């Protein structure tokens, strides 16, 4: 078996052992708090903007915190929303395709509804008063400048004289992945620039310099799927700034076979790249790329790789620290589907680009480090003070020797891969019912340290709020899912996510619309100190009276209680109710069950992460015993199910939860078992009168009462008795029963006995709220 197959089997085996265990606790991978779409709206935690037509068909989103605006690109339109209000006064600019473009798109065989329109896909800041917007233009990409005004103004209109071709800036298709960033008046874009989507390139355009693009050599880009582009400075010398592209590509198998594999890359080009003078004219002369590795170590050195790059978030640090790259990956294996989050230090990426180049003698050979002499200036290095040395005036890439450019063209790949921090993912998800598409991160200062809160957007319209606790070294981090927030009413893939640390808001976009979501709402965790502490949310702390937002400036106050790493309320919440006190505070609720039938005792803990335990106190016993489950008694997620109730099951059941050593009582239920002999006494059998023969034809069969199906499903053993009782109740107060019951004289007799049935019902504490003249549902329908 191949090493990768061994790794997959090892990972699946571990997941099956973990997920299939009969332990009482689902673990911290289950969200502690689940909030539905309605819950978020009622708590005033989210605000939704769906556009004037009820659906935006969102394609692009740009968060401008300088202007306090959120700009959206949709179907034939752009929108501007103010951040200081919940979308009360949006601005809209209609931007349909130019005359004739839609018709030409249809003639070329494209779909008139989903493709032959202007899908606005690029929104980039152009200057202090304008945005650069580009759309697909019905498969004829178009760009224009959008006036947005100065800070404090809420204006939005398109400059008609600025409309120009967007080829090389925006994809032709509305669904094809791409990435772009705007730097010093120029747009850098990674995309497929042709109508058929086959010509992949990295393109620079829009400024005073000539346009620059990738070489057409297939060794540079193999069917890339661009995810992100960003300018990342390396030092104080701006001439050394580079634009980094994060993407996946499909390459030939490294073993020289005919198969292809998917790998993730980080590539870069210099901002001041001007191409070559004789070689690589108007082409990138500083392009390099390296592999991004995100894998789970397995036995024997085998690794399970997550090779498909889904999204990237740059966590900019405070002064003196290295930038961190959070990357979301997925598997491309047909065996199982999984997702992982890996974190890379930017210093490690720089080290790889300063390392050896990858080289092989031919397509059938293995890759190895280049062992020859590397020309000067080193290929991939930007023209700067380092290269403009006395006697070697390399002030521009056009001054680079031809051998440098030829080497750069032949060796764009680095030999060393970029490995994540601690050598493994900080988060692995392989048991999700949904897929993960988007990631943003917020670094939060808590009482016991600093934590990175990860927000993950799914394909079902929900957001997962997660923290990963690293124990140190290469140990596997502990994953804690804090919340699962259903942002949109209808399940829809989340395609855009932006975070505003200043406003403590998350902006979530989908094809339907955009939502403004608070990063935290601490009071939803509960009203007790223990519940606030067990939540382990870095945003929240107990202030002595309630669970509120933690502010580091106030963190030194004595009564601020917070424990993210351990979540131990016993240490943080002294004087709170213990288990024995909690049992006495929860009143017991009476529950009745019938012998030999099924009965369900419901227990819904506040936290799905807690371990649930059932205790039974039988009459006469000194203390409670733990309920033992078997084929007859089942422990489900929502409570305790008795498939066949016994008279010995009577007693007081206490449902308790245990989480991080803290136990609390959820519910107490006093189960009273009604034995079968008692039912026989309550409903004595009566002789059945002879039925008159049918008048010709087939004998008519009375319709079956609706309640009989339910009683048969739960295995009720005294169906004739209940049937008899129900007929008496329905016939009470009427002069004639329905045709599906007995004769009129029989109904009069039943009316006389119906009061006895009511008295019996009172003794059984049954709750009958039906009206006096209620009839079976089947009779009402006739």
From Swiss-Prot:
What is the protein's given name? Semaphorin-3G
Disulfide bridge partners, by residue number: 105-116, 134-143, 270-382, 294-342, 522-540, 603-655
Glycosylation-annotated residues:
44, 127
Q: Where is the Ig-like C2-type domain?
A: 569-671
- Please give the biological process terms from Gene Ontology that the record holds: axon guidance; negative chemotaxis; negative regulation of axon extension; neural crest cell migration; positive regulation of cell migration; semaphorin-plexin signaling pathway
Cited Pfam families: ig, Sema
Location of the Sema domain: 32-519
Q: Which organism is it from?
A: Homo sapiens (Human)
Provide GO CC annotations from the record: extracellular exosome; plasma membrane
Query: What family classification does the UniProt entry report for this protein?
Result: Belongs to the semaphorin family.
Extract the GO molecular function terms from the UniProt entry. chemorepellent activity; neuropilin binding; semaphorin receptor binding; signaling receptor binding
Which PROSITE patterns does the entry mention? IG_LIKE, SEMA
């Amino acid at each position: 078996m191949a090493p990768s197959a061994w790794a997959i089997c090892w990972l699946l085996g571990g997941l099956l052992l973990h997920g299939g265990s009969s332990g009482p606790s689902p673990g911290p991978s289950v969200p502690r708090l689940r909030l539905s779409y309605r819950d978020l709206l009622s708590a005033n935690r989210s605000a939704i903007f769906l556009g004037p037509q009820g659906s935006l068909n969102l394609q692009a989103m740009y968060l401008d915190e300088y202007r306090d605006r959120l700009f959206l690109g949709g179907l034939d339109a752009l929108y501007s929303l103010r951040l200081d209000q919940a979308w009360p006064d949006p601005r809209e600019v209609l931007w349909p395709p130019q005359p004739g473009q839609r018709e030409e798109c249809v003639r070329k065989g494209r779909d008139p509804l989903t493709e032959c329109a202007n899908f606005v896909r690029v929104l980039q800041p152009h200057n202090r008063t304008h945005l650069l917007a580009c759309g697909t233009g019905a498969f004829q990409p178009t760009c224009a400048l959008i006036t947005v005004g100065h800070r404090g103004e809420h204006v939005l209109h398109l400059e008609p004289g600025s409309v120009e071709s967007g080829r090389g800036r925006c994809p032709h298709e509305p669904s094809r992945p791409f990435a772009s960033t705007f730097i010093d008046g120029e747009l850098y874009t990674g995309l497929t620039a042709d109508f058929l989507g086959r010509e992949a390139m990295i393109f620079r355009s829009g400024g005073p310099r000539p346009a620059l693009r990738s070489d057409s050599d297939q060794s540079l880009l193999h069917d890339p799927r661009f995810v992100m582009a960003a300018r990342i400075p390396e030092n104080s010398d701006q001439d050394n700034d580079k634009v980094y592209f994060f993407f996946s590509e499909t390459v030939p198998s490294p073993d020289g076979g005919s198969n292809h594999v998917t790998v993730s890359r980080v590539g870069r080009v210099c901002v001041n790249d001007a191409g070559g003078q004789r070689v690589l004219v108007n082409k990138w002369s500083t392009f390099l790329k390296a592999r991004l590795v995100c894998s789970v170590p397995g036995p024997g050195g085998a690794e399970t790789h997550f090779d498909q790059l889904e999204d990237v978030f740059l966590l900019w640090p405070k002064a003196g620290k290295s930038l961190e790259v959070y990357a979301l990956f997925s598997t491309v294996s047909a065996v199982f589907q999984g997702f992982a989050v890996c974190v890379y230090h930017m210093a490690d990426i720089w080290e790889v680009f300063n390392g050896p180049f990858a080289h092989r003698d031919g397509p059938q050979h293995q890759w190895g480090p280049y062992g020859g002499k590397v020309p000067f200036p080193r290929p991939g290095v930007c023209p700067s003070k380092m290269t403009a040395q006395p006697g070697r005036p390399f002030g521009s890439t056009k001054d680079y020797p031809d051998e440098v450019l030829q080497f750069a063209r032949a060796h764009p790949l680095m030999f060393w891969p970029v490995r994540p921090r601690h050598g493994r993912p900080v988060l692995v998800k392989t048991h999700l019912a949904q897929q993960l598409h988007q990631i943003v991160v917020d670094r939060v200062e808590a009482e016991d340290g600093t934590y990175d809160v990860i927000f993950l957007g799914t394909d079902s319209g929900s957001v997962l709020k997660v923290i990963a606790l690293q124990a140190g070294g290469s140990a596997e981090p502990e994953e804690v899912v804090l919340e699962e927030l259903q942002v949109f009413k209808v399940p829809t893939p989340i395609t855009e996510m932006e975070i505003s640390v200043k406003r403590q808001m998350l902006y979530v976009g989908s094809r339907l619309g955009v939502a403004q979501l608070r990063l935290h709402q601490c009071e939803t965790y509960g009203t007790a100190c223990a519940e606030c502490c067990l939540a382990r949310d870095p945003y929240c702390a107990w202030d002595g009276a309630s669970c509120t937002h933690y502010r580091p400036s106030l963190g030194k106050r004595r009564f601020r209680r917070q424990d993210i790493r351990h979540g131990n309320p016993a240490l943080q919440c002294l004087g709170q109710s213990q288990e024995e006190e909690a049992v006495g505070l929860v009143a017991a609720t009476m529950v009745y069950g019938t012998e030999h039938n099924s009965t369900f005792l419901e227990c819904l803990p506040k936290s799905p992460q807690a371990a649930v335990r059932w205790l039974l106190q039988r009459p006469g016993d000194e203390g409670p015993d733990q309920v033992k489950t078997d084929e007859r008694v089942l422990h489900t997620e929502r409570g305790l199910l008795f498939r066949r109730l016994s008279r010995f099951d009577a007693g007081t059941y206490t449902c308790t939860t245990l989480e991080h050593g803290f136990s609390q009582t959820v519910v107490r239920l006093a189960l009273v078992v009604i034995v079968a002999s008692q039912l026989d006494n309550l409903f004595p059998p009566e002789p059945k009168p002879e039925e008159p023969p049918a008048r010709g034809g087939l004998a008519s069969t009375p319709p079956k009462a609706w309640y009989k199906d339910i009683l048969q499903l739960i295995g009720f053993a005294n169906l004739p008795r209940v049937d008899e009782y129900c007929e008496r109740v329905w016939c009470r107060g009427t002069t004639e029963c329905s045709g599906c019951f007995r004769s009129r004289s029989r109904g009069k007799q039943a009316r006389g006995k119906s009061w006895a049935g009511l008295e019996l019902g009172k003794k059984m504490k049954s709750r009958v709220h039906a009206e006096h003249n209620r009839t079976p549902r089947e009779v009402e329908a006739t």
